[in-house]
Amino acid sequence: MHIIGIGTDITECPRIGRMIQDHGELFLRRVYTEREIDYCNSRKQSTEHFAGRWAAKEAVLKALGTGWIRGISWRDVEIRNNPSGAPLVLLHAGTRDIAESRGVRQVLVTISHCRTYATAYAVALAQENLPPIVPSHFDDDIPF
């Protein structure tokens, strides 16, 4: 496997808490899958877990090199947990299509959070030795 993209994000837990308080189910169902909502609500500090998943979704899209382009929704990136509790990335719909078109075979993610902040780091991996994703505006000058 070869790294073709990395991404990181940090978000304020109280900000996500306010979004949940102000917009309730509308916000939750727009951003999180049913499984994510169930998982976070089952945790003692649910706001921190929602914020961690928010940061993870942002980090994954940065690792894929897409950002929030048309055709991608929050729910297209799902963060679940493997049996040992480690976060696991599942890609759906437009996000999955973009990842496959770029040769991505796996996205790894790690999440940390406290009362104030949640942070996540993601790595997109390809099976083949593909070149890194370079924005078209760089043309001949490839950044290192």
Listing of model-derived features with the role each one plays in the protein:
Residues 1-144:
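Core catalytic alpha/beta fold that binds nucleotide/phospho-ligands
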